């Protein structure tokens, strides 16, 4: 199952820099492991925003929920999820 996910990050201004840096380091490691596994095949930064558009390729809604709630920055995110399916006019043979 493919999902388009927008993640907007809002780290509190009063969070100590060391704490924010540690959370961001864990977030990077977690997201890169998911990218290497193929569960998170695409991620794009939104210019001028602390946000991204991502594509997730997972087995179920529950799996996606577990991945998203496992993000170290989850508590500081607004997340919008849109399920995707192949368009009948697509010229691609795969989901990439």
From Swiss-Prot:
The keyword Magnesium does not apply. It catalyses: (S)-muconolactone = (4,5-dihydro-5-oxofuran-2-yl)-acetate. GO terms for molecular function: muconolactone delta-isomerase activity. Keywords: Aromatic hydrocarbons catabolism, Isomerase. Pathway: Aromatic compound metabolism; beta-ketoadipate pathway; 5-oxo-4,5-dihydro-2-furylacetate from catechol: step 3/3. One of its GO terms (biological process) is beta-ketoadipate pathway. Disulfide bonds: none annotated. InterPro entries: Dimeric_a/b-barrel, MLI_dom, Muconolactone_d_Isoase. The keyword Isomerase applies. Its EC number is 5.3.3.4. Homodecamer. Belongs to the muconolactone Delta-isomerase family. This is Muconolactone Delta-isomerase 1.
């Amino acid at each position: 199952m493919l999902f388009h996910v927008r993640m907007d990050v809002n780290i509190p201004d009063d969070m100590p820099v060391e704490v924010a840096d540690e959370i961001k380091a864990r977030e990077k490691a977690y997201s890169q492991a998911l990218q290497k596994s193929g569960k998170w095949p695409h991620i794009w930064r939104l210019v001028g925003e602390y946000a991204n558009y991502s594509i997730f390729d997972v087995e179920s809604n529950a799996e996606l929920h577990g991945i998203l709630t496992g993000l170290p920055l989850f508590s500081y995110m607004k997340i919008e999820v849109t399920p995707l399916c192949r368009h009948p006019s697509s010229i691609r043979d795969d989901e990439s």
